[in-house]
């Protein structure tokens, strides 16, 4: 990481009734921080929130992270299934300017390689202003698989993770230029969008 790279502000939101009330320790935010710290070359400012499965509170938190905290990227974890209190996608779509359905489609494709119940996930991606918001699974292993994708024994991608598309999406909505460690995840951009290395 160097001072020539753009600062990235990332909101991490864990949505869980039990973790937010202290019944058990949240694992989502630490898993996200660990993965992002390994994957990103940019300096990162994290804004973290641990909240219950309450749609108005999720909406307010997402709005605050996008509009007040100035996050370029917001990642949520938890609350994406079909149960009555799984309302993270509903809150996410409610605050969106535009829905990006390809993110949810790819997340389900990745998870279907492991469990047939992946089709029950309602994960999605949206844009609010200049912020990309993505709903991720709640389990650390699933978070890593979703972001990074699935690789064969030689390290070649079998299924691309969603994060490969995140830097270019953020470019297109006016955010900072994100650089990744290719050994973790290789960001994809068209050649015309690749920034020349700084001297």
Please describe what each predicted stretch is.
Residues 1-199:
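Non-catalytic beta/alpha edge segments that cap or flank active sites
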């Amino acid at each position: 990481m160097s001072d020539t790279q753009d600062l990235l502000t990332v909101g991490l939101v864990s949505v869980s009734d039990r973790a937010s009330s202290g019944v058990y320790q949240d694992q989502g935010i630490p898993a996200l921080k660990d993965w992002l710290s390994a994957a990103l070359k940019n300096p990162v400012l994290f804004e973290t929130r641990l909240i219950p499965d309450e749609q108005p509170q999720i909406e307010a938190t997402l709005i605050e992270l996008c509009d007040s905290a100035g996050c370029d990227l917001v990642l949520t974890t938890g609350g994406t299934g079909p149960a009555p209190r799984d309302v993270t996608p509903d809150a996410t779509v409610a605050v969106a300017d535009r829905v990006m359905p390809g993110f949810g489609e790819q997340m389900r494709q990745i998870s279907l390689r492991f469990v047939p119940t992946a089709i029950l996930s309602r994960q999605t991606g949206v844009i609010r202003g200049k912020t990309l918001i993505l709903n991720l699974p709640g389990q650390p292993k699933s978070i890593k698989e979703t972001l990074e994708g699935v690789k064969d024994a030689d390290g070649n991608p079998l299924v691309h993770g969603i994060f490969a598309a995140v830097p270019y999406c953020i470019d297109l909505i006016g955010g900072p230029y994100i650089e990744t460690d290719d050994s973790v995840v290789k960001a994809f951009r068209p050649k015309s969008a690749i920034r020349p290395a700084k001297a």
